[in-house]
Amino acid sequence: MSRFTRRKFLQASGAGLAGILATHQAPSFAQQSTVHWIKWNDFVPASDELLRKQMLPEAMKAIGAKITLETVNGNDLQPRVTSAIQSGSGPDVFMLFNNHPHIYGASAVDVSDVAEAIGKAQGGYYNVAKANTQDGKKTLSVPWAVIGAMTSYRKSWFEEVGYNEFPKTWQEYHDAGKKLKAKGRPLGQTLGHTFGDAPTFSYPYLWSWGGKEVDEKGKVVLDSKETLESVKFMQAFWKDSFDEGGLAWDDTNNNRAFLSGTISATLNGASIYIETLRKPDQYKTEKDRPMKEDIRHSPLPRGPKGQFGFHLFQSHMVMQYSKNQKAAKEFLKWIHTPANYEKWFVSQKGYSTPPAAMWEKHKMWDEDPVMAPFKIAGKLGLSPGYAGPPNRKSAEVLTKYIVTDMYAKAVQGMSPQEAVKWAAGEVQKIYSGA
């Protein structure tokens, strides 16, 4: 594929957004507005610093409104949006994860006008972006980014146990993990109630065995032979190969464990690798070499029914209770203008993948081959609720961690049959409206 220079890239992508900010004059409606934007604490801190020190001052000048950025732990976003909706006041713009917009759609401003212009100008949104933000009646939120979930692993350690490439199947991964754990280098994975690494592991694992919550028509089919086999395998896999303390981990514990050299692999975004790039003298291998040289990335292994991915998706919802809806929309238009969004995207160094296809051509992807697997994460990921339609019910199942808990219960001693029966019953309650 031919690569674009930055000038050509921005010229091509900006054409479709001409007129979004056609003049340099701030919109008159926004002169006294203050837009309160709440998002997660980025796992690439440099990006939040860029927003605060450079991009938001530029945005305020461009749209004529004050913008207040609040950052919180990603696990706190759902409680905050729920509380704001109940009280009828709070941030004007909420960052949400995955299919969560379907839960709060009744309280969302229709942002079709903003999102459609951005998607059209930037090569079209990936299917996962459309599925998570559109309910068939309106666009609930504006797609922001896809955070690729890949396995970060220590290349040399896997080579020591006979794997010159990352294991292709779950059976191979089990074998490698068992050997690594015997050497004091277990695999690391959370099965806790944390928004990122737990579901992005448990859902693709389930799908790869042929299990799924619902079929194409939305009928609950979780209680199946395929699901049961996945749980049986997980029981032995967990005991033999993983750091069993991972049951209580959040989305930061595995980063710390990997960087301290106590685990050999973990499903994660690229934040571990990016941290070793940022501090090469701090993170060293046992041979006193920069750890960054020994890190590689790979998709999750293949199961009996294929290889799947679930990548953390982010979007921004403008709230109906907001008195600054127009200014909030103008801000989202501004920040998604390619010349502006590119600054943030480049600061992420590949940790976040834009939700539209045009960005696959960006030159940044050629700069570091270790990051190459993340380039097409948005193209390959599925949404929770597969193979059924994305909706409020699938979002509720995700929010309640039912799929993750099914595996967590089994590795803590519940029989596979009981764990599957419990999970299927919980999913059925949600889909039947019980």
Model-predicted regions and their roles:
Residues 123-132, 290-299, 346-404:
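Long, aromatic- and glycine/proline-rich binding clefts that accommodate carbohydrate-like moieties
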Residues 32, 55-125, 156-168, 255-257, ...:
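Extracytoplasmic "Venus flytrap"/periplasmic binding protein-like
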Residues 136-144, 149, 174-220, 226, ...:
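Extracytoplasmic/periplasmic solute-binding protein
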Residues 1-17:
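N-terminal secretory signal peptides and thylakoid transit peptides that target proteins
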Residues 97-150, 168, 174, 201, ...:
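Hinge/lid segment of periplasmic solute-binding proteins
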Residues 34, 66, 83, 159, ...:
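Conserved C-terminal helix/tail region of periplasmic/extracytoplasmic solute-binding proteins
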